[in-house]
Amino acid sequence: SQAAKPGSNDDSCVLEIGNGRARVLLPGDISARVEMRLQREMTRPVSLIVAPHHGSRTSSSRAFVRLAGAPIAWFSAGFGNRYGHPHPDVIGRFQDIGARLHVTAWSGALSWSSRDPDRVGEERLEAPYWRAPVSPVGSVSSW
C-alpha cells in the first residue's frame, strides 16, 4: 500500500487508549484508506470514538464505524465551519449503529471519564461561560 505523503491528513497520529474499563479511539484526520488498515488491527469495539477528520465525507466509512462499534461518537468541528463538518452522511453512519452523538459546534467543550463511561459532559449546555460564580462582597473570587 502507498505511504501517506508527509504532512498529509493520513500522516495523523492515531491513538487507542484503554485502562481495562474503557477504550477510546482518537484517529486524527485519517481518510477511509487508513481506516481500512486500522480495521485489520481492531479486535473489539471501543467505548468512545472521536470521528476521523471532524466527520468529513472522506472519513468514517460504514465498515469502520461498524467495527469501532462505539456507543459514543464525538465530532470536533467549529460552529458554521466552511467545510460543513460533520457531514450528514457520516452522522447517519454513526446513528445507524445507535451511537450517541456529541458535536463541539453544538455542545461546546466535551468531557468524558472512564470512571463513568456512559456520561459525556457538555460545557456550553451545562455551564454557560458567561455565568461567573458570585463572591460575597469584599472577598476575591477564586475562579
Language-model region placement:
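Active-site-proximal loop/helix segments of hydrolase catalytic cores
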Residues: 1-86
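Binuclear metal-ion centers of metallo-dependent hydrolases, dominated by the metallo-beta-lactamase
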Residues: 3-9, 79-143
